[in-house]
Amino acid sequence: MPLPSRASSTPKISKACVPCRTRKIKCNAAVVGLPCGSCVSRECPDDCVLSARKRRTVKVRNAEAPRSRKNIPDTNGSVLSPRQQQLPTNVSRQTTDSSHSDPVEESIHASHTGSSLRNDTPHSRDRRPPGQAQADLLYLNILQDTVNDTSAAQTDASDHQSNDEPDDSFNSQIHHWNPPPQLDDVDNEYLAKKKVFELPPPRFMDDIVKAYFDYVHPFAPILNRTDFIQSYRLGTCCLFLLHAVAAAASLYVTHDVLLGCGYPDRSTAQASFFSKAKLFHDFHCQGDPLSMLQGSMILGAIILDHPSDRDFQYWFHNSVRRASKMGVQNACLRDDGSQKLYRRIWWVLHNRDIFHFFINTQNMRLLANAPPIRPLTEADWETEDIEQWSGILSPISQAQKVSLIAQCELAQIFGNVMSVVTSSTPSAEEIHKRILPLDAWRTSLPDRMQLMASFADGEIYHLEALTTSYRFECIMCRLLRRGRWQMSDGGLREWAQQRFRSAIFELDTIVKRVMINNTIQKLPTTFITTITALLALHIESALDAAESSLIRSMARISVQHTMLALDQIRDTPAIKRALPAFEIVLSKNKLYPTSSSDTEQINTMQAISQDQTLNDGHILQPAQADMTLPQDDQSFLYGDFIGFDFLDRWQMEQLDFTGIY
């Protein structure tokens, strides 16, 4: 029989072959010899080889090996070679044509588990390394603390013993006792059929990564850029993180790049990358703790063109859970190379926590009891040498750094406001006092961002910060004037009404400015979805019988301008999903022209509004305009439709605008 003879003619094998080790599946090479049954079934017998075993001392095994895994290996490193050279054929065959393949492409399309962060500082006895998740079970935490305390006591008595050796040894034993889940052949086959191991061709993937760092990363700098690019080039970057990056960047690449990746439009591309990242997450088969945290945070800022159970709230909760498990809040207090990255990560989570609660007070503050940390400064960005990566990375500008710092300050301001309005006895005087820093904050932004007189790239970060502030001021003032927090002070409601209208005017001006300068496609998702919130506010004013005819007519004009802005970004998945609902409401109430005669009438109304001052007695109204909302759509006026939850709770047949992220 062939199998026994093959086994007898080969040396004794005591470990799995390289493809099976990479895919983390059971290998029968020790029984049948090489090639093993798994490689034969996958039709890749030539790849079935054994990795060279390296001799190492006990000290290197226990201390140096875990540390080296946290570093990015160089091109000659032994960690990278098996993953680069032993690519499973069934995966590489599904990527790009072999004539276009190179070592970088092969390594990118392999299954990677490397970390993109360097963290080789000595361990603290009081805090775990930030890249290492704490044990899930209480008894393991107690045992680990005991080992650390014993190690510290022995070190005080004898200086020749290292502090981190016992800790690393114990941690490695914990991982040995609690091995990660292994994927079987069925799981691997399912993931392969879903094409989760595939990435776009390298030239298009480079465009995607560049778009991410140009348009997404500046507003949430949760990656170490140079470390990420190095691991991406070496092929050790986590595929979960890469798919998350691609999902976010798909909104900003050109149509030619989308076609080169095999996608007809942005919605299809984003949904595909999002689905692949979700599969990696669900199967627990990719990524170190830091990469999983970063990928979850990126997915938490994505809105698909269809409802999903894994909405932004899910990924935000998942991000907070992972950050707490990793001890990121403690890593912010460390004095080493990783501190800057972890401080930025924690502040981004902190900002989202406040904004989510501010939008919808039914949401719970997840980080309300977290210990305070120092505010961000411009020193919390790494000093980078990007000369060799100049084709992908651009220098970080002053405006980009100030943008995140300003967002943190804005979150603190609105956090203080919410602590007052949600208290048992809120007073108008206290609310006025807490909102005063907002005006000074806005005035200081141009000088801090070093903006030029003409419209430049730095203006994008200024306008995005202002947009966020006016958006949340609209939310607060709208709720105050509607009596959301049981406040009967008539003067406070009048004050809230004035600030609400001023904020609406500023948002209209900002939207028109980005349209004129043709930069609306460069702005982040938070700005894009603010436009839909602004449109909802204009619709509310146009249909509100309590408003004067002047306000209602001005709102109708603003509806046309806002719809024009949305039309420029209608290929964005979030807008593609929202437009049908708006068009139904606008069409039923004749707020949006559906014929050439309607368009001419709207243009005439806009021209008169620019030539003369309108008053309540001289208002042009569209013919047969119905100023009341039909009974079946009354829910439109009663919901909170400018929050974060709109597209993930919205049902087309209900037209219930409950918020938008």
Curated annotation (Swiss-Prot):
Where composition is biased (Polar residues), the residues are: 73-98, 110-119
Keywords from UniProt, A to Z, are: DNA-binding, Metal-binding, Nucleus, Transcription, Transcription regulation, Zinc
For this chain's UniProt record, which GO biological process terms are given? DNA-templated transcription
SMART domains recorded for this chain? GAL4
Name the source's superkingdom. Eukaryota
Write down the Pfam families for this protein, in alphabetical order.
Answer: Fungal_trans, Zn_clus
Q: How is it used?
A: Fusaric acid is phytotoxic to plants such as cotton and banana. It has been shown to induce programmed cell death in plants. In addition to a mild toxicity to animals, fusaric acid exhibits acanthamoebicidal, antioomycete, and antimycobacterial activities.
Any keyword Nucleus?
yes
Where is the protein localized? Answer: Nucleus
Single Gene Ontology MF annotation: zinc ion binding
Cross-referenced SUPFAM superfamilies:
Zn2/Cys6 DNA-binding domain
The protein's job, in short, is:
Efflux pump involved in export of biosynthesis of fusaric acid, a mycotoxin with low to moderate toxicity to animals and humans, but with high phytotoxic properties. Constitutes a self-protecting mechanism of the fungus against critical levels of FSA within the cell.
Q: Write down what this protein is called.
A: Fusaric acid cluster transcription factor FUB12
**Organism in which the protein naturally occurs:** Fusarium oxysporum f. sp. lycopersici (strain 4287 / CBS 123668 / FGSC 9935 / NRRL 34936)
Name of the gene: FUB12
